[in-house]
Amino acid sequence: METLYRVPFLVLECPNLKLKKPPWVHMPSAMTVYALVVVSYFLITGGIIYDVIVEPPSVGSMTDEHGHQRPVAFLAYRVNGQYIMEGLASSFLFTMGGLGFIILDRSNAPNIPKLNRFLLLFIGFVCVLLSFFMARVFMRMKLPGYLMG
């Protein structure tokens, strides 16, 4: 395998360059990277790529039995389609659940007082459970009759 790597360098000669990092480029802080990851997670789970390509409406409308138009936030019976508000609401729930797991992880630090640990555990569990059960409610709105035991 080493000979295969050596073959191109028998013909090519590597230049002797001394590259330096520009002085205005700095290592971002951990919280900056974390914020970028959370924002990108929110946008991707919200279906921003789908929204840009398909250009769905922000909310839909449905005609009731009296002939009046009623706004709806969920595109029912379509798993592979969504309104913009539906994607944002689902993305908020997924992000809240992920943040709940991160809060639960942060509650394991050894130097946290007992009251703060209890509050972090409570907030983490509330975020995770609320996002889970609201996602189930959203699935029932999206696919009526689904998950009915």
UniProtKB/Swiss-Prot annotation:
- Name any GO cellular component annotation: endoplasmic reticulum membrane
Q: Which UniProt keywords apply?
A: Endoplasmic reticulum, Membrane, Transmembrane, Transmembrane helix
InterPro entries per the UniProt record, alphabetical: OligosaccharylTrfase_OST3/OST6, OSTC
Topology relative to the membrane:
Multi-pass membrane protein
Which Gene Ontology biological process is one annotated for this entry?
protein N-linked glycosylation via asparagine
Regarding protein family, the annotation reads: Belongs to the OSTC family.
User: What is this protein's function?
Assistant: Subunit of STT3A-containing oligosaccharyl transferase (OST-A) complex that catalyzes the initial transfer of a defined glycan (Glc(3)Man(9)GlcNAc(2) in eukaryotes) from the lipid carrier dolichol-pyrophosphate to an asparagine residue within an Asn-X-Ser/Thr consensus motif in nascent polypeptide chains, the first step in protein N-glycosylation. N-glycosylation occurs cotranslationally and the complex associates with the Sec61 complex at the channel-forming translocon complex that mediates protein translocation across the endoplasmic reticulum (ER).
Stated name of the protein? Oligosaccharyltransferase complex subunit OSTC
Q: Give the species.
A: Mus musculus
